[in-house]
């Protein structure tokens, strides 16, 4: 008998159906010589500090360096603290029963670091030593499962992948647990946390926010002239900006209705914009955020759902290339995409005979290839699934389309002994850009705001028919959006536009394609950042933490990127795990010392007018907001269910009696809902739910 373990029930049931294990049991499927069971995500994880005898945070216990680390059944946070997840415990017993009945195991968890870790932690926790093989596939279609089952890999071949995942988990534990406890001791605020990856990411957001907020805009002036001939005109700009209005006006005064300009240079150049590579997860997340305002977490969850429905390949990929042996499948997919309603017009002229092959490179495909659609026809996609599927399908058309051909035109002229310049770009052949034909893409082609279409010849003398000045001002770097933050995480904050250079930097990025969405989500959950429109900005709490640790190693973006590279070296057999763990333990000790040595200023205690008594001041403290009038008694606990009210929420509640809608409350049964926090008639805190929209009567 052979056991197969998948990562989720739906995947396990699909595999069972394909291999003929059709008899349904409690927590597994049986038949045809197989027992197919499944995990429910991470059933086993690293134990919390209490398992090693550590109580509340104390200076004497830090740094905590467990040796060895202990594994425990997944735990969940409740009002009584951390308790064992009953559903995880139950499924582990099923897995234990299945493994005990079988001679060998086939590992069918997701083909990546986390999928490998999920199985290995279960395997080690249950104490098994039975041999296992690896089902390593990039899609869940029936054909892919059959092909994978006939080409199983030795489990030992993925030991280094497991070691990298295990080291990453232990590194996160060491830095996160120790730095957070040190922060609690140094600041006197126990509910804040630091992390190996979350803190450098917070530092990037805070640094950009402060740079943007504190930017002092400087005015400057531009001088422009209009040249016209035979009813056609072109606007030229002075080659230098003026720092003062007086200087600009003095220069402007040199012109008269009789002024002419001599064309001194006309340069035409053909330029080409290569088709983009196929999507990896991060570029998909960036584009879904830019064009459809979807968060990185939402994009990943939708892509995962499409993968489990067999509509797309494995989503957590870091590759933007495919191998030559996939081209037959891709060719068939391109025919299908070309008939989709969204691409039908472009599909009529798509050149199937001369495909752009820059996304096809066997040497650049590692564990998984780029994101592509499968041959399975989608059925009943919801709105977000339709968006993500269309984005992936459209990117395939773009990637295999011709490059975009442009003509750039630069003209220079001399007028009144001054030099002027006009730049413009015209698309000659849109190539891949015609797939989506986005308006915002077309606007990027206008390199300067010069108007007109006239084209002059070198040596011509052209009348100056208009001239004027315009005031401009310098602008700061924009705040991060999720799309631009993801790009910055890939390059550790470096501004890199060249695609080849970006690919080379991937080894030094913060996080991985599979983890970046979770990092951003963690910052939201910690109340360290919030959204302002599409921008990500720090909360008061987030800025407070950043100011305290910004110069420390725990917030060092490039150092965090170097850790990612060492994890990749472990995965590639070029670095020993002991070497990495020794470095992380030393780093943890250093970070702990640094944080414990912090001198935190007492947080400013804000106060707001009391809406209940009208005379007292409501003092805002870390855990409560309380009126200072002893006869009033207004008291607001800042923790409501799983949410903590930030100062903005308290301002809304105390000034208008209700907060704005707060998303992501969790009830006692774990159900998620949205609500506002409000006062009732007696100033008790309650939840207010949005009214459901009623349809129009017919």
Model-identified regions with their sequence ranges:
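Conserved short loop/turn motifs at secondary-structure junctions
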Residues: 1-3, 110-111, 188-191, 268-277, ...
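Metal- or metallocofactor-binding catalytic centers and their adjacent structured scaffolds
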Residues: 243-279, 285
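Intrinsically disordered, low-complexity regulatory segments
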Residues: 1-169, 173-175, 476
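C-terminal or mid-to-C-terminal helical accessory/interaction module adjacent to the motor/catalytic core
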Residues: 87, 100, 142-225, 268-269
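Amphipathic alpha-helical transducer elements in NTP-driven molecular machines
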Residues: 9-16, 33-36, 40, 59-62, ...
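Active-site phosphate-binding and catalytic loops of NTP-dependent enzymes
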Residues: 23-27, 130-132, 155-160, 181-185, ...
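Basic, low-complexity terminal or inter-domain segments flanking catalytic cores
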Residues: 2, 81, 125, 214, ...
